[in-house]
């Protein structure tokens, strides 16, 4: 059983590799229970399906499938670490309130969008193999409105004014290059599960820009 396998591994590490097995970190968990590993929640889900046997009888077959989940506290903690979220309590319920990030207000408009894009893409790239990776849509919602409020605090605008200035459907910041004017858009690629392999990460290439007379903006 699992205890015997653990004992054999411990013996091999001690006698052959001269290493010590940490009892605190080497825990045996029932496959039906959730285990936390590398910031993923891992468990085996019971899937039942009907199959016909060789005699033509229909039988219910149960097969366990390993599931990887994004723990909700992980993406919530990221928001708190970025100071993009305040959690309020009303009638015993948690209310998520996106807030502006004071330490980004002095950055160029282009740098602000790049910062948010890098943080959203970074979390998605880490969890893209999770079965419930789509929950990062909640993370993205808070980040997007935090960005709106950051621009609002910078230019003394309401969210409606910010969206009117930079785009309602596609939020984008204009900047100048040798090839002319370009636009950097806020992340819009979604949060689909990646089945296998490691995809090449999408990043915002840092553009070469021409500054205007406004020292706090790269916008022409």
Predicted regions and their residues:
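Non-catalytic terminal/accessory segments
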Residues: 1-220
């Amino acid at each position: 059983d699992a205890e015997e396998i653990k004992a054999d591994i411990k013996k091999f590490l001690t006698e052959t590799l001269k290493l010590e097995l940490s009892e605190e970190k080497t825990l045996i968990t029932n496959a039906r229970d959730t285990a936390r590993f590398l910031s993923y929640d891992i468990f085996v889900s019971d899937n039942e399906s009907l199959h016909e046997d060789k005699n033509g009888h229909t039988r219910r077959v149960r097969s366990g499938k390993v599931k990887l989940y994004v723990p909700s506290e992980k993406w919530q903690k990221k928001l708190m670490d970025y100071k993009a979220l305040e959690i309020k309590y009303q009638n015993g319920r948690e209310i998520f309130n996106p807030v502006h990030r004071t330490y980004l207000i002095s950055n160029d408009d282009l740098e602000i969008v790049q910062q948010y894009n890098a943080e959203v893409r970074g979390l998605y790239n880490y969890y893209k193999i999770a079965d419930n990776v789509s929950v990062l849509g909640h993370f993205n919602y808070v980040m997007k409105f935090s960005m709106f409020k950051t621009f609002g605090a910078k230019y003394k605008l309401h969210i409606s004014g910010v969206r009117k200035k930079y785009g309602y459907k596609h939020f984008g910041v204009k900047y100048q290059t040798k090839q002319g004017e370009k636009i950097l858009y806020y992340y819009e690629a979604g949060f689909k599960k990646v089945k296998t392999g490691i995809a090449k990460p999408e990043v915002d290439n840092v553009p070469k820009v021409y500054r205007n007379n406004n020292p706090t903006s790269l916008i022409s």
